[in-house]
Amino acid sequence: MKNLFIALMLLFSSIALSQTVENDTKTVQQPQQIESKVNIKKLSENEECPFIKQVDENGNLIDCCEICCNPACFGCLN
């Protein structure tokens, strides 16, 4: 009975340890995602954008500086 109790304690402690490691991994990944959102926000606030005004597929004028300074943004071409 004593051996069974010890075996169960070891099993549950290893499960708890693996969950703790998994939770720590999730915590580490979150700041990277937040940082990328902040960078996009900074890019969208940049007033010295090299992009000229473009027209979307509906003929609406797009000021690319209002969207972002990333050339991958929709409608923004150099």
Curated annotation (Swiss-Prot):
Q: Where in the cell is it found?
A: Secreted
Q: Which UniProt keywords apply?
A: Disulfide bond, Enterotoxin, Secreted, Signal, Toxin, Virulence
The yes or no answer to whether the keyword Secreted is present is yes
Q: Which GO cellular component terms, listed alphabetically, does the Swiss-Prot or TrEMBL entry include?
A: extracellular space
Task: Return the PROSITE patterns for the record.
Answer: ENTEROTOXIN_H_STABLE
Where does it mainly reside?
A: secreted
SS bond partners: C64-C69, C65-C73, C68-C76
Protein name listed in UniProt: Heat-stable enterotoxin STO
Query: What GO MF annotations does this protein's record show?
Result: toxin activity
What InterPro entries does the entry give?
A: Heat-stable_enterotox_CS, Heat-stable_enterotox_STa
Q: Which Pfam families match?
A: Enterotoxin_ST
Specify the taxonomic lineage: Bacteria, Pseudomonadati, Pseudomonadota, Gammaproteobacteria, Vibrionales
Q: Propeptide residue ranges?
A: 19-61
Q: Signal peptide position in this chain?
A: 1-18
Record's family?
A: Belongs to the heat-stable enterotoxin family.
